Regions:
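Generic structural signal for well-ordered alpha-helices
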Residues: 4, 31-32, 59-64, 90-94, ...
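Active-site pocket-lining/capping segments in soluble small-molecule metabolic enzymes
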Residues: 8-10, 120-155, 197-262, 276-278, ...
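Acidic (Asp/Glu)-rich catalytic clusters
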Residues: 8-13, 32-36, 60-72, 93-101, ...
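Conserved, mostly hydrophobic/aromatic
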Residues: 21, 40, 96, 169, ...
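Glycine-rich anion/phosphate-binding loops
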Residues: 29, 81-97, 123
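Active-site glycine-rich loop that binds ribose-phosphate moieties when present
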Residues: 155-172
Length: 373
């Protein structure tokens, strides 16, 4: 099922959910296997050659890793279109689609230094949404989200102008909106109401920021055009230099704001800007009761039919086992040292013994059984 349909289904059923955003290179992403987010979001980091799959920590590489190694089907990749031609942007999009990524956050992106802008490389998020919708073979699979700014976009002349731009992106084919962070729950509530009044009826997910320090919050707020309320500034000033206290406050603030949004049913989904802080994000999700103890990998395996997999054991006579051969796999060492598991013994190469992997899930565990052929 396409991510857009899953989001709509959760909203219609009033079922709480969350998503996680990482900025390459992420840390502790494996810790979120058991959190079961609806989707994982990877930012487009221009300074790290984001579209190059040969760069281990590029945005595209991280998204592919989340998709393949974490068995997370819903991976969203940020994609910008400003400063490059349509052909270049579409190459990155098709590359992501080829890696199984079916979700993108369409963004214009910041101006790139040293780039001379012409009509061939100056585009907006609306253009990218339209390009994505023009790919016929992924029409029913591709989900496209766009960004919304609850206090208005810093490059727009007014708040109402931003709302009109957002409406244009939705009309171009965007499935849902993910907002920039905000610092008061009522700001998001008002933004959502204003969107509904002008006909923006797609789901709107609030962006919840877990800032790392007072300095980082001030910097991000300035870049985003977000005003920091006076009561928050006072708390940050009172704890100046105390990093632990500031992070604890950031967690408390995010919890109180999220709890209010969920309890009043202003939203049913939260988009967590993790700032690559798995511990803080995990604490927030636990306090909100959104942390699930079912692994993503197991959840996906149990959705389909269970299949038995049979493989034949490679038997190598003891005299022929050399150090070179031993290096082929770590599991050989116990057999050479005599430290064998109960019931396991050396056999001749002709012995009709196979190892059958039975996908017999009892709760959350699988069993390995040794049986005669």
């Amino acid at each position: 099922m396409a991510l857009a349909r899953q989001v709509n289904k959760r909203v219609e059923s009033r079922e709480a959910f969350f998503s996680l955003e990482y900025a390459p290179p992420p840390s502790g992403k494996d810790k979120f296997k058991i959190a079961n987010p609806l989707f994982i979001d990877v930012t487009w980091f221009e300074r790290n050659d984001p579209g190059n799959l040969c760069v281990p920590n590029s945005s595209s590489s991280i998204a592919a890793i989340c998709r393949e190694l974490l068995a997370q089907p819903n991976v969203m990749l940020h994609l910008t279109c400003n400063g490059r031609t349509k052909v270049e942007t579409m190459r990155y999009l098709r590359q992501a689609l080829g890696k199984g990524i079916r979700n993108v956050l369409a963004l214009r992106g910041d101006d790139v230094k040293g780039v001379e802008y012409t009509k061939e490389n100056s585009f907006y998020a609306t253009d990218l949404v339209q390009w994505a919708r023009d790919i016929p073979e992924y029409k029913d699979e591709l989900s496209v989200s766009v960004a919304g700014h609850p206090v208005g976009h810093p490059n727009c002349s007014s708040y109402s102008e931003h709302l009109q731009h957002l409406k244009t992106k939705v009309e171009a084919g965007a499935d849902f909106v993910i907002t920039q962070f905000f610092l008061e729950a009522e700001v998001f509530a008002q933004f959502k109401d204003d969107c509904r009044k002008i006909g923006i009826n797609v789901p709107i997910l609030p962006g919840i920021l877990l800032f790392r320090s007072a300095v980082s919050l001030i910097r991000i707020a300035e870049l985003s055009g977000v005003s920091i309320p006076s009561h928050i500034r006072k708390i940050l000033e009172a704890n100046k230099g105390n990093i632990a206290a500031v992070r604890n406050y950031a967690l408390h603030h995010a919890y109180e704001m999220s709890r209010e949004l969920l309890s009043k049913e202003i939203t049913h989904g939260l988009h967590i800007y993790t700032m690559n802080q798995p511990e803080s994000s995990g604490l927030l999700l636990r306090r909100l009761g959104l942390w699930q103890t079912v692994s993503v990998l197991e959840h996906q395996l149990l959705q389909g039919p269970l299949t038995k997999i049979v493989c034949k054991v490679i038997h190598v006579p003891v005299p022929k086992r050399t150090k070179v051969w031993d290096k082929r796999a770590d599991y050989v060492a116990p057999y050479l040292t005599g430290k064998l598991p109960n019931g396991v013994r050396f056999t001749k190469c002709s012995h009709p013994v196979h190892v059958r992997f039975c996908s017999c899930f009892n709760g959350r565990s699988a069993a390995l059984q040794r049986v005669s052929a």
